[in-house]
Design a protein with these regions (language model features):
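Terminal domain-initiation and capping elements
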Residues: 1-101
């Protein structure tokens, strides 16, 4: 093949890869869920160390919400379901939401 044809094709066939959209997982404050349970959720479900878990829990308590992390949609939605299931199982009204970054 002619080198000119290959050069023309080379530039046009490079696919553009788009990174997946990111979403924030946010815990919301309520008057019933204990601080200890929130910390436990952060450590067990989100794999936060104790220091980060306590910082996020205090944000939830003092500011009304705390950003847990950024994930792709599938992971964020799964995390929310896990939080709600754990809260139901332990009879707490803890809520968690997802918002686009």
């Amino acid at each position: 093949m002619d080198g000119k044809i290959l050069n023309k094709l080379k530039g046009k066939t490079t696919p553009k890869i788009k990174e997946p959209d990111e979403f924030r997982v946010i815990l919301l404050n309520d008057d019933y869920t204990t601080m200890d349970f929130v910390v436990e959720v952060l450590v067990v479900l989100f794999h936060k160390d104790l220091e980060d878990a306590n910082r996020i829990m205090l944000d939830v308590h003092k500011k009304g919400k705390g950003i847990v992390g950024q994930y792709t949609w599938d992971i964020a939605a799964t995390k929310v379901e896990q939080v709600h299931a754990a809260a139901r199982e332990n009879e707490f009204p803890l809520r968690c939401i997802v918002e686009p970054v």
